[in-house]
Amino acid sequence: MFRNTPTHSDKSTIIDILNSSGYFYDHETMVAGELIDENLEKGAERSGYNFMFADYEGKTVGFTCYGPIACTESSHDLFWIAVHKDFMFKGIGKQLIQETEKCVKKAGGTRIYIETSGRELYKSTRGFYLKTGYILEAELEDFYGPGDSKMIYVKKL
């Protein structure tokens, strides 16, 4: 089941999901929590942060955070997509990204951009983006640090 309205309890849930993955630094997971706070305080439209949650048997097991890119006509960023490690590789991520794409399209969005790390740890993530129809648009070498490129993917809706 999917829902797009965050609750106050979702902040700790998404931090738990991110921590379970082993992909993110603590300062990164805190940012995700702050985006929920922004959404709850200002609303999705004013904050620019929309959410999609995947719930399974009453438990949130994955989420996306996305929003329009300022000063563009119809481009959106996918800021976050994560699935709890116990539910990875079960198709939940694919369903989450498809539901997110539907919402972006319904809002008039025509492109979604995703940024991720070029580190080896993220190889499966980059493969996931390719499998779900995203194209590698650019690589910014050593962006995050030596040997850690920023990989930018795009999908036309």
Each model region followed by its residue ranges:
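Glycine-rich ATP-lid loops
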Residues: 89
